Amino acid sequence: DNAPLEDVSRAVRYITEHAEQFHVQPEDYAVLAYSSGGQIAGVFGDAEKGWQKYNVPKPGALLLAYPINNFSLAKPAYTALLDVDDWMQKHYYDYTLSKLIAPDYPPVFLWYGKSDRILKLFGFDQQGPALQSALEIDGVPHEEKVYEDVGHGIGIGLGTDAEGWLNAA
């Protein structure tokens, strides 16, 4: 039904089932994702649409790097650049991550840059700031880092103001 969420759940299931072999703690795992993947990871953090629906343990934390909170604002750009089909409309545009936040949501480390042109194109205030606000309102443990001169697609941020964010998380 939702291939990206199914992929995340299969990965979590595989890793937790092989926890001893991989030397990981299956009861306290984190999901790290960037950009649109950050939205997918965020939806996975919702019990109804994510981890519980797919019968895997709840994430111990979500690390969301410059996530897309509200894809509906991206629709004009995606329509212009890509062949947007019904599947994408159903699984991306219908989810606004901040609307899925609830008090039992996993703890979140959220970061993004003020110079992120993609987030600006998609309505900057409706992305990271809106997600942070929802986390705050629902009392979800979280940390937000906003970097001045950081754009989109920089991964772990080597050579940027965001360098070291992964250690901070």
Task: Give each language-model segment a name.
Residues 10-76, 92:
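Primarily recognizes the serine-hydrolase "nucleophile elbow" in alpha/beta-hydrolase
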Residues 24, 106, 140:
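Short glycine/serine/threonine/alanine-rich loop segments
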Residues 29, 108, 142:
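Hydrophobic anchor at the start of a short beta-strand
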Residues 36, 56-65, 72-85, 89-91, ...:
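Mature catalytic domains of secreted/periplasmic carbohydrate-active enzymes
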Residues 54-61, 67-75, 89-129, 133, ...:
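The feature captures the conserved acid-bearing segment of alpha/beta-hydrolase catalytic domains
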